[in-house]
Amino acid sequence: MMLSKRVLCIQNMQGHKTIFACPICAQAVQIEDNGKVVCPSNHSFDVAKQGYINFMTKAVQSMYSKALFEARHDIISSGLYDRLQERLAELAVGTYFLDTGCGEGSHLARIVANRPEATGVGIDIAKEGIIAA
């Protein structure tokens, strides 16, 4: 049976819980099996059924659409950025990659594919991009 995106997100976060902190108080968080992410001050966030977690502390309007992220994915998949992604993977130090403004995650996925020992973490304020990931 294939696991849902939500369950995969929870399992991935539990496996790398030391890299996450509460966006409100900066304390370490616990990732519970039910998808609740909570800190010692009881700030809590829930993993969405689509397999992402919203750590934003206030609503943000994004001007990016699903169509934009689909087009972005197509361009990145065309190979246009292959050499750049390979070079970034070569230059990177450490086992974690943080891609801020990751969109649908195409760049990060291709960089991490060149570094199988590494873990990629992508964040973006555009919900459409994160859902597409």
Q: At which residue positions do the language-model features occur?
A:
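Glycine-rich helix-loop-beta junction characteristic of Rossmann-like nucleotide cofactor-binding loops
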Residues: 87-93
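Conserved SAM-binding loop
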Residues: 133
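Class I SAM-dependent methyltransferase Rossmann-like catalytic core
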Residues: 62-83, 87
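Short beta-strand element of Class I
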Residues: 118-121
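N-terminal auxiliary segments of SAM/dcSAM-dependent transferases
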Residues: 2-62
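Conserved class I S-adenosyl-L-methionine
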Residues: 94-103
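Conserved SAM/SAH-binding beta-strand->alpha-helix loop
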Residues: 124-128
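Conserved SAM-binding loop of SAM-dependent methyltransferases across substrates and taxa
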Residues: 104-116
